[in-house]
């Protein structure tokens, strides 16, 4: 089985502005501030290009095992609608998308961790 937390397939399509893409093309890397630490987030052109070549959401995703997707609706990095789109594209019939209304990108609060552990436990019970 698979558990995804704030899964962001195809983020190179929607996660970068035209200005970001231009900077990547001209400078080979992009430095962005992040709320998750003091150091900037570094994205290299090679990383971005590999993401472009590995896009998934254009068609069916050939995954047939049970999948659980956890997504915070207050996530500023990955819009929660992305989890729904991913769920639609997965070939598996055993897909559940769990939205945490006040959850952020990390889903790291005690209640979020409890949800993750419970989700893992119930998924393991199905295998």
Task: Enumerate the predicted regions with their spans.
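The alpha/beta-hydrolase serine catalytic core
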Residues: 1-99, 104-123
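Alpha/beta-hydrolase-fold serine-hydrolase catalytic core, especially in secreted/extracellular enzymes
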Residues: 125-127
């Amino acid at each position: 089985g698979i558990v995804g937390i704030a899964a962001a397939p195809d983020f190179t399509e929607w996660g970068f502005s035209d200005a970001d893409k231009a900077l990547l093309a001209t400078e080979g890397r992009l430095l962005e501030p992040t709320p998750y630490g003091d150091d900037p987030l570094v994205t290299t052109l090679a990383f971005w290009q590999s993401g472009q070549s590995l896009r998934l959401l254009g068609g069916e995703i050939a995954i047939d095992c049970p999948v659980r997707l956890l997504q915070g609706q207050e996530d500023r990095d990955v819009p929660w609608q992305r989890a729904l789109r991913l769920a639609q594209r997965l070939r598996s019939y055993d897909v559940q998308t769990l939205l945490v209304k006040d959850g952020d990108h990390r889903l790291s609060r005690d209640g979020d961790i409890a949800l993750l552990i419970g989700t893992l436990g119930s998924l393991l019970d199905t295998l």
